[in-house]
């Protein structure tokens, strides 16, 4: 778990997200409070629950990106879900408890990957031994006993060095590999999740016991054998316990479009289902125990971050109990052309840097001038204002349009250095931007 201070967390987030300082401060404090809680004694630690966050702001201003980057900084299990995908218990659709099951699956994969990486060196040695067994089969007498072990040992040493150096990578061998277990998804009726989990485990166990002889190059075989040997070195039950603990103490759930499950205006039949989803979410956010195929997971200390545009509904349209479970509210501001200029140039791996790097692979040097950046940002702001405001996502559309000719004709372009200035941008965008009907459909 990260032990960074709030200011350090905000500084890290600044590398990827422009503006929205209030939201960054809120999530930085929430993450630091997790570290503070873990320093306390066990009894007091159980009493301190996370302060869930409600982000309010239009689309494309950085709500999801803030939560996603926060989870990466914390090295925590993270899942993003859309509130509209869930239905009240008894209706057709996904139940909210599947959020925790999916989060636990993510944690198991994450912990498993970390454990395998730690065992990779040992697994590599074992994989090399298996390949040597194929290359140097020990001689056996008529009764099946191994003989000439000294000669076999000498032969293994002879092959070991070129194997380590990769000199045998192109040589083909036949190898016995375990078949990858098939991941079978079974839709379960309400209340029968435990039986579904047992059926899934049974089918996966059956397929995991199968082996198949394959012919391949030693280089490819070595990679597969390293993964197989590393998997044998880790303890699945121990991994599950570590993953469940990670979910319970460090898990982050991001619920998007929470404003779409608000009841607003006059009541209708759909409002019943919307309010039902809120009531189903309530136990998860308050703290309950959810049954997963990996074990029981308590949600008391999982951090929930909800977000929504709240253009039609208001946060007060949420049921009072759910409002009370999101005590920290931050409003994210709409982005201006000045913000777009910064987004195009300042973040790590900014959009302009990405396009420069892509074209560099074709031997073309792209240079964005300051007035060119200003024109692109202005165009994005204008289209957002005239049509639908989709925030920073508009920059992807605008830039793709600006770069279209270069991307398509990259192999034919003789001029290997291209400057994108305001004149170039206007030439490629002016017709579309000035024609509102065209910009509505194309940009």
Swiss-Prot record:
| Domain of life of the source | Bacteria
Entry keyword set: ATP-binding, Chaperone, Cytoplasm, Nucleotide-binding
List GO molecular-function terms, semicolon-separated: ATP binding; ATP hydrolysis activity; peptidase activity; proteasome-activating activity
Question: What GO terms describe the biological role, i.e. biological process, of this protein?
Answer: protein unfolding; proteolysis involved in protein catabolic process
Q: Does the keyword Mitochondrion apply?
A: no
**SUPFAM superfamilies in the record:** P-loop containing nucleoside triphosphate hydrolases
- Entry's InterPro entries? AAA+_ATPase (IPR003593), ATP-dep_Clp_protease_ClpX (IPR050052), ATPase_AAA_core (IPR003959), Clp_ATPase_C (IPR019489), HslU (IPR004491), P-loop_NTPase (IPR027417)
A Pfam family cross-referenced in the UniProt record is AAA
Residues recorded as binding ATP, renumbered to this chain, are: 18, 60-65, 256, 321, 393
The places in or outside the cell where this protein is found are: Cytoplasm
> Which HAMAP family does the record cross-reference, listed alphabetically?
HslU (MF_00249)
Summary of the function given for this chain in its UniProt record: ATPase subunit of a proteasome-like degradation complex; this subunit has chaperone activity. The binding of ATP and its subsequent hydrolysis by HslU are essential for unfolding of protein substrates subsequently hydrolyzed by HslV. HslU recognizes the N-terminal part of its protein substrates and unfolds these before they are guided to HslV for hydrolysis.
Any idea what this protein is called?
Answer: ATP-dependent protease ATPase subunit HslU
Recorded source organism is: Hamiltonella defensa subsp. Acyrthosiphon pisum (strain 5AT)
Lineage of this protein's species? Bacteria, Pseudomonadati, Pseudomonadota, Gammaproteobacteria, Enterobacterales
């Amino acid at each position: 778990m990260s032990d960074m201070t709030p200011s350090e967390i905000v500084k890290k987030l600044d590398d990827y997200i422009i503006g929205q300082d209030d939201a960054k401060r809120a999530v930085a404090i929430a993450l630091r409070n997790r570290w503070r809680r873990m320093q306390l004694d066990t009894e007091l630690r159980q009493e301190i629950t996370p302060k869930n966050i409600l982000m309010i702001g239009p689309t494309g201003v950085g709500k999801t990106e803030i939560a996603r980057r926060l989870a990466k900084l914390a090295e925590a299990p993270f899942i993003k879900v859309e509130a509209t995908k869930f239905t009240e218990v008894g209706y057709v659709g996904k139940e909210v408890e599947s959020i925790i099951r999916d989060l636990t699956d993510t944690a198991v994969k994450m912990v498993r990957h970390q454990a395998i990486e730690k065992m990779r060196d040992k697994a590599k040695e074992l994989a090399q031994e298996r390949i040597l067994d194929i290359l140097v089969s020990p001689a056996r007498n008529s009764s099946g006993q191994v003989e000439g072990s000294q000669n076999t040992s000498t032969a293994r040493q002879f092959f070991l060095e070129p194997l380590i150096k990769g000199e045998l990578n192109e040589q083909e061998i036949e190898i016995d590999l375990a078949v990858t277990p098939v991941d079978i998804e079974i839709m379960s009726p309400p209340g029968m999740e435990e039986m579904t989990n047992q059926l899934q485990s049974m089918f996966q166990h059956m397929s995991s016991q199968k082996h198949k002889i394959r012919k391949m190059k030693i280089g490819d075989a070595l990679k597969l054998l390293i993964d197989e040997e590393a998997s044998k070195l880790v303890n699945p039950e121990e991994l599950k316990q570590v993953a469940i603990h990670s979910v319970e103490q460090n898990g982050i759930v991001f619920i998007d479009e929470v404003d779409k499950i608000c009841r607003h205006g006059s009541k209708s039949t759909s409002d019943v289902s919307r309010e039902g989803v809120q009531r189903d979410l309530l136990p998860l956010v308050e703290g309950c125990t959810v049954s997963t195929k990996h074990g029981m997971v308590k949600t008391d200390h999982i951090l929930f971050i909800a977000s929504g545009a709240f253009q039609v509904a208001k946060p007060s349209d949420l049921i009072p109990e759910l409002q009370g479970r999101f005590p920290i509210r931050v409003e994210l501001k709409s982005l201006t052309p000045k913000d777009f200029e910064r987004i195009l140039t300042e973040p790590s791996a900014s959009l302009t840097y990405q396009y420069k790097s892509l074209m560099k692979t074709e031997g073309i040097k792209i240079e964005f001038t300051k007035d060119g950046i200003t024109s692109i940002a202005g165009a994005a702001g204008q289209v957002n204002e005239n049509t639908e405001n989709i925030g920073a996502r508009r920059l992807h559309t605008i830039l793709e349009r600006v770069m279209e000719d270069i991307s398509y004709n990259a192999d034919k372009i003789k001029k290997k250095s291209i400057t994108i200035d305001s004149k170039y941008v206007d030439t490629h965008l002016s017709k579309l931007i000035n024609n509102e009907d065209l910009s509505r459909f194309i940009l």
